[in-house]
């Protein structure tokens, strides 16, 4: 027997009361985005489950993709069949025969939500357990902690059989907590910050600053690859490339070296906030970790934050670098992040950046710039690209590798 579908159990959505169906519909849409590389698949949701019908698609890559989607508490590959006792008996016998090995223990766990069905849960447990013993007389039944728990659900539309329960990513469906702008440099920290923001349901749009010719096309591709990795957790992400060369050259030519980083970050914050307002975002997200580098002392954060009243979310602010690296490795962004391409934060980095910059000094140095004009030109020059999941590209690359 081949699996018919993947049954997805919802996570925190069960606590959302009147908004529950809005959350479930958003999860359904996110699942459809993530599974877009599998064109035969169809997705249907109800209040308790989301059903991913395989329609002949190999279930394993689908499970691997679904495991990463935020809002999924657990999932099970299932066999779907008509609500017929003879069909159930045959299916249970076939499944247990395929799983059997010496010493295997099992139990049947039936749940009947269709109370019009001819047998109740207790009767089904007894009948189906007996059917297993008919074909496997040496198998052992065990009610506590068996090797296999064969779950049978009798629902209004069909019967479902499963024996695996795979842990999902948990969290909230991406997009149910509003929209935020993720400042993504290409380093280790900001993709992890984006991942954690996605987990709490934030729909992120990535803002990346590019300063050609000082930053290379490789640096831009790296940032887009990191964004593509993040699409696995909730679907497509808008990638916003910001032209930043003019501003960085102005700062380099007109500001004291010790304040280069502070002024650069203040301009980045202004521009990100202007893009947020233009695109109806609610917050800014970044990868700052307290005390990690010169621009991430409290004094620096205060001087940089002063350009906006928009809330700034810093998901990794209290994490050690090793903790951030471990999470980056777990979400598969680390190897991309350490590719040796310079970003806007490193190309003009001073040898001795100011670790306790004074807000008054920063504002005094900025009097040398046409702030509004520089910000306006940067915002008007943005390039927006929709980044989609990478599964199709990976499959094509694997096919090419196999042919070669």
From Swiss-Prot:
GO terms for biological process: thiamine biosynthetic process; thiamine diphosphate biosynthetic process; thiazole biosynthetic process; tRNA 4-thiouridine biosynthesis. The keyword NAD does not apply. ATP binds at residues 183-184, 208-209, 265, 287, 296. Residues 60-165 form the THUMP domain. Signal peptide: none annotated. Its EC number is 2.8.1.4. It is an enzyme of class 2 (transferase). Pathway: Cofactor biosynthesis; thiamine diphosphate biosynthesis. InterPro entries: Rossmann-like_a/b/a_fold, ThiI_AANH, ThiI_fer, ThiI_N, THUMP_dom, THUMP_ThiI, tRNA_STrfase, tRNA_sulfurtransferase_ThiI. The keyword RNA-binding applies. GO terms for molecular function: ATP binding; CCA tRNA nucleotidyltransferase activity; tRNA binding; tRNA-uracil-4 sulfurtransferase activity. It catalyses: [ThiI sulfur-carrier protein]-S-sulfanyl-L-cysteine + a uridine in tRNA + 2 reduced [2Fe-2S]-[ferredoxin] + ATP + H(+) = [ThiI sulfur-carrier protein]-L-cysteine + a 4-thiouridine in tRNA + 2 oxidized [2Fe-2S]-[ferredoxin] + AMP + diphosphate; [ThiS sulfur-carrier protein]-C-terminal Gly-Gly-AMP + S-sulfanyl-L-cysteinyl-[cysteine desulfurase] + AH2 = [ThiS sulfur-carrier protein]-C-terminal-Gly-aminoethanethioate + L-cysteinyl-[cysteine desulfurase] + A + AMP + 2 H(+). Belongs to the ThiI family. Catalyzes the ATP-dependent transfer of a sulfur to tRNA to produce 4-thiouridine in position 8 of tRNAs, which functions as a near-UV photosensor. Also catalyzes the transfer of sulfur to the sulfur carrier protein ThiS, forming ThiS-thiocarboxylate. This is a step in the synthesis of thiazole, in the thiamine biosynthesis pathway. The sulfur is donated as persulfide by IscS. This is Probable tRNA sulfurtransferase. It comes from Streptococcus pyogenes serotype M5 (strain Manfredo).
